[in-house]
Amino acid sequence: MITKLNSNLLDVTIHFTDNEHYYSYTVSEIYDPKKADFFKQFFNYDPIVCDVTCNNDLVSTVIHDYLDSDYIFDIIENLNELADGKTEDQFLEKLELLHVYYKCVDAPEIKAACECVEDQNYIQISDCWTDQDLGIALASERGLLHQLEKISTEDTCFENYFDFDAYGRDCRIVEDWQKYNGSFWKFWEN
């Protein structure tokens, strides 16, 4: 049974138990954050509180509505059905059958997806202290600064953003930027 489910746009972390053992997997969805149309997938910034069954108890889990809410709930429902009363091998076998639908990595690679990359494989922006700083830096780096600076009703990839703080916040969530010693850094996946 799934005991905990944390989700953002990129990852769904599953803590799975078969009443004897405890497992943890990360199912990574496939997106290219460097593409402009990546940001069109945002719908709103309202969180969804999901009830996930945990040993006959309901555990409320907050999931930000970056994907279609029905899609998120379908994932939770199906994963609960798969995990309930299944062994680890059965769970992984069923999950592998669903990996195309969920855009997940293949089941044998789930454990590998949980492993951290080498410490040297990271990039750091040392002069960014806030989400707004990060948003400005990333927009400038990607040549998109002018699109964020103008307020327009045009259908652009930044139509949902009204300030650099919101853009930086979502870049941080989506791209797994971490704040450490006053600066932002992230793992760089080769």
Where are the predicted features?
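Mixed-charge (acidic/basic) macromolecular-recognition segments
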Residues: Y22, Y31-S152
